[in-house]
Amino acid sequence: MAPQTETKAGTGFKAGVKDYRLTYYTPDYQVKDTDILAAFRMTPQPGVPVEEAGAAVAAESSTGTWTTVWTDGLTSLDRYKGRCYDIEPVPGEDNQYIAYIAYPLDLFEEGSVTNLFTSIVGNVFGFKALRALRLEDLRIPPAYTKTFQGPPHGIQVERDKLNKYGRGLLGCTIKPKLGLSAKNYGRAVYECLRGGLDFTKDDENVTSQPFMRWRDRFLFCAEAIYKSQAETGEVKGHYLNSTAGTCESMMDRAQFAKDLGVPIVMHDYLTGGLTANTSLAIYCRNNGLLLHIHRAMHAVIDRQRNHGIHFRVLAKALRLSGGDHLHSGTVVGKLEGEREITLGFVDLMRDDYIEKDRSRGIYFTQDWASLPGTMPVASGGIHVWHMPALVDIFGDDACLQFGGGTLGHPWGNACGAAANRVALEACTQARNEGRDLAREGGDVIRAACKWSPELAAACEVWKEIKFEFDTVDKL
């Protein structure tokens, strides 16, 4: 094998001593049903051939290294290597390409999202031949999917446990997120739940701080849940954040929540770790707890268009690892989300079979082989005027979380919750009657205001509040 030692002028980049194309670029390869497929957006360094860059990604994320080693002869590299089988330019972008790579199933440990990510994205992102690299999508074959439990319960079982059908679920993140005592925190939870919400939520960074230790919070929130259930006759819940500094502490918190008889706990799956999340999901399945997942830290990984990991991949990873809810963006609120792309990964979270559709960012057809679905959670800067769009975009199988849009009501938390509940039911009824919420949503809300003073007050407060900025992909 001829070494490459040429230094590219003006870049200081040395292509290395091994030509990956000879082994790992295989455009004639026929993809197998059992292969794990990856679509990488890559930006090669100046002077690096695109085929070499694609082959390098395949090599460094599977069996390759920078030189030939004698132990290559002790195994069958042709059986275990990743293969770059196709490369296409990204329309409208200079020097950006989508590299399609197939990985044999035997490269991965069964039931381990941690091992899957360690192999595919663990090392290759620092490769010198690439200026930038982004994992856009993965195809998980049924043969691998079947090695995972997935979400503890899934959407249908959650509805059965809650006895709530025919509409989206309503939630609220308690604010201020930090600083309240446990008793005052529980009071805020109670007011929201008795006003008409289905759930309230710990914020992602509420764990066990000096002003509110986790055990005290769990106790006061459980009291709020039971009191509001007795008043309303509905099943209520609060996402008790079980994320902790150690896996042992995390499991202790989940165990305490189970002992209290509450229906749901919460985990920050990226900061807490995928291994910890899978363990918690298995515990929740075995003990009848729903599991709400927050995606804290996701934007560090997924926000840049040319480097990192797209959220659709993180969403697929979570569905494998296990979670009944996952924050997914809103399209209409303060947090970023483009409509068609967001709907693409929302479908990947909750549907069983999703066809390839590049207009929605779906690079591969995904068959989840009856793995339970994960309910998307829309939150971040939304209020009652957004309700028609949210019902139109997400449909019924979603949890709509109004934090400031509940607690910011001028008459208090319970009235804010009532306003959101009235708006949701009015929009759901209008949709069921065949009305076009995208065009008539404002009229639906205004009509509902006539018989809900709480909604009328909310509409007056938030009538001018908008979050209109371009997404990062357009900047």
Curated annotation (Swiss-Prot):
It comes from Tupiella akineta. Belongs to the RuBisCO large chain family. Type I subfamily. It is found in: Plastid, Chloroplast. The modification N6-carboxylysine is found at residue 201. The modification N-acetylproline is found at residue 3. The keyword Chloroplast applies. The active site is at residues 175, 294. It catalyses: 2 (2R)-3-phosphoglycerate + 2 H(+) = D-ribulose 1,5-bisphosphate + CO2 + H2O; D-ribulose 1,5-bisphosphate + O2 = 2-phosphoglycolate + (2R)-3-phosphoglycerate + 2 H(+). The basic functional RuBisCO is composed of a large chain homodimer in a 'head-to-tail' conformation. In form I RuBisCO this homodimer is arranged in a barrel-like tetramer with the small subunits forming a tetrameric 'cap' on each end of the 'barrel'. Its cofactor is Mg(2+). One of its GO terms (molecular function) is magnesium ion binding. Substrate binds at residues 123, 173, 177, 295, 327, 379. Its EC number is 4.1.1.39. One of its GO terms (cellular component) is chloroplast. This is Ribulose bisphosphate carboxylase large chain. Heterohexadecamer of 8 large chains and 8 small chains; disulfide-linked. The disulfide link is formed within the large subunit homodimers. SUPFAM superfamilies: RuBisCo, C-terminal domain (SSF51649), RuBisCO, large subunit, small (N-terminal) domain (SSF54966). One of its GO terms (biological process) is photorespiration. Binds 1 Mg(2+) ion per subunit. Keywords: Acetylation, Calvin cycle, Carbon dioxide fixation, Chloroplast, Disulfide bond, Lyase, Magnesium, Metal-binding, Methylation, Monooxygenase, Oxidoreductase, Photorespiration, Photosynthesis, Plastid. It holds the Pfam family RuBisCO_large_N. Residues 1-2 form a propeptide. The record marks 334 as: Transition state stabilizer. Mg(2+) binds at residues 201, 203-204. The disulfide bond which can form in the large chain dimeric partners within the hexadecamer appears to be associated with oxidative stress and protein turnover. Coiled coil: none annotated. The modification N6,N6,N6-trimethyllysine is found at residue 14.
